[in-house]
Every structure is written in C-alpha cells, then in structure tokens.
C-alpha cells in the first residue's frame, strides 16, 4: 500500500524538512517487507488563495485513495491504534493511503467531509512544517510497530 502525505505549499530548506525526509526514507525502507510503501510527500501549490482553491488542487491527487484529513477536529489516536489502522487498511486491500495537510487556514470543510477519516495531533495548533514532520514520524512509528521493531516502546 502506497502512503502519501499530500500537503499544500512547499517547505523551505529547514530542520523540519530534513526530519520529514529522514522519516519518509525510514518508513519506506522498513515498510517494504510489510507491503507498505513507498512513502512519499507530495507538495501541492494552489494557483489561487483560499481553502476552496486549495481543496481543488488537492483533489487532483486523491483518485483511488483512502483519504485521511489532518484536522484539529479529528481523532487523536495512540500510536498503536494508528499502526493498527494502517495495517487494517493494507489487509483490506487499500492500494493507496493519503494523508492531507491543508494550508495556513486548514482544509476546506467540504474536503474534510469527503475524507474517509480525520486525524488530529491533539487539541493544539501546530506549525505546518512541524505537522508534516510529526505525521512522517508517526507513519514511520506505525510501520515499525507493525514490523515488531523495538523503536516504539509502550
């Protein structure tokens, strides 16, 4: 199952960008034997400002995908539950899992409503670059849990 983090905007070179690359590479390598991956980040530029225009740009990357929207009103899941969900989707034959990260104002409510699920990183608001890094790390953590790796400790 391919895993994509589809996000509005391009990140400048930064420590967060390096973290995203590190965890995407780790998740891709660890997931290969489990039928997970590759893991990729797709940066989407919207030609017009606003949530509706951003949603239209994001929709171009969602065909045939199980979509989870990163949204502050979503469910915050423990890492094991997150891993179990990814494993369950893989076992159900989902070929592509997409996590959506919106722009500075979040995702368009209509796009969130169309998603198969919503994910939150708790009640706080996080900077865009950190949200990407945290999601990439959690995807890697989920893959390592499914692989039985000692990376995650309860």
From Swiss-Prot:
Cellular component, GO, one term: cytoplasm
Amino acids binding S-adenosyl-L-methionine: 102
SUPFAM superfamilies named among the record's database cross-references: alpha/beta knot
Any one Gene Ontology molecular-function term assigned to this protein's record: rRNA (pseudouridine-N3-)-methyltransferase activity
Gene3D superfamilies xrefs: 3.40.1280.10
Subunit-structure text: Homodimer.
Functional summary from the UniProt entry: Specifically methylates the pseudouridine at position 1915 (m3Psi1915) in 23S rRNA.
Family, per entry: Belongs to the RNA methyltransferase RlmH family.
Name used for this protein in its record: Ribosomal RNA large subunit methyltransferase H
């Amino acid at each position: 199952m391919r895993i994509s983090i589809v996000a509005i905007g391009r990140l400048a070179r930064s420590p967060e960008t390096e973290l995203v690359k590190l965890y995407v590479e780790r998740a891709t390598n660890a997931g290969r034997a489990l039928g997970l991956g590759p893991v990729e980040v797709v940066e989407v530029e919207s030609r017009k400002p606003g949530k509706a225009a951003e949603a239209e740009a994001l929709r171009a990357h969602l065909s045939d995908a199980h979509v989870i929207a990163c949204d502050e009103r979503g469910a915050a899941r423990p890492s094991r539950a997150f891993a179990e969900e990814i494993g369950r989707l893989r076992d159900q034959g989902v070929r592509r899992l997409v996590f959506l990260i919106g722009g500075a104002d979040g995702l368009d409510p209509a796009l969130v409503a169309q998603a198969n699920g919503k994910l939150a990183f708790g009640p706080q608001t996080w900077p865009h670059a950190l949200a990407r890094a945290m999601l990439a790390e959690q995807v890697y953590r989920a893959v390592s849990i499914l692989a039985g790796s000692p990376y995650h400790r309860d």
